[in-house]
Curated annotation (Swiss-Prot):
Tree of life domain: Eukaryota
Gene giving rise to this polypeptide: coaA
Cysteine pairs bridged by disulfides in the record: none
SUPFAM superfamilies membership: Actin depolymerizing proteins (SSF55753)
A molecular function (GO) term: actin filament binding
Database matches in InterPro entries: ADF-H, ADF-H/Gelsolin-like_dom_sf
UniProt name for this protein: Coactosin
SMART domains named among the record's database cross-references: ADF
Annotated ADF-H domain residues: 1-132
Family the UniProt entry places it in: Belongs to the actin-binding proteins ADF family. Coactosin subfamily.
The species this protein was found in: Dictyostelium discoideum
Keywords from the named record: Actin-binding, Cytoplasm, Cytoskeleton
Modification note: The N-terminus is blocked.
Keyword Cytoplasm: yes
Length: 146
């Protein structure tokens, strides 16, 4: 298990959840082998987060708020991202899936979960397709003419 006791983790998660501010992502990193701490947060969406995540020698976890839906129904959706760069050693890579469970003790409201390992995987369009597919109802072809 990883150490996720830092109060900054929960505070950053709560900030991303809240619609009352512009913060739409937070990023957690390792401090040592097992302690997970806040690395950063921002309001620039997936594009900004992808720049922060793209670290080939790091293991990271991120939480992202996106807006999805159609003209009839826009809503916030939440994405949990795990990142394990291609330069991470085998033992550390193996710990990502185990430690992910610890991070999920802090991050609980997850609509979509993705795992990335290389920069080419960081594609916003593909991510939003996954978010839309997970969202359920789509009223875009069912417009009312009243």
């Amino acid at each position: 298990m990883a150490d996720v006791s830092s109060t900054e983790l929960k505070a950053a998660y709560d900030e991303v959840l809240a619609d009352s501010n512009d913060t739409n992502w937070c990023l957690f990193k390792y401090e040592g082998k097992n302690k997970i701490v806040l690395s950063g947060k921002g309001s620039g969406g997936f594009a900004e987060l992808a720049q922060e995540i793209n670290q080939p020698s790091e293991r990271l976890y991120a939480y992202l708020r996106v807006v999805s839906g159609d003209d009839e129904s826009k809503r916030s959706k939440f994405v949990f991202i795990s990142w394990c760069g291609e330069e991470v050693g085998p033992l550390a890579k193996a710990n990502v899936s185990v430690h992910k469970a610890s991070v999920k003790q802090v991050i609980k409201n997850i609509g979509v979960e993705v795992h990335y390992t290389v920069a080419d995987d960081l594609n916003e369009e593909e991510l939003m397709t996954k978010v839309r597919k997970s969202s359920g109802a789509d009223y875009s072809g069912n417009k009312s003419t009243n």
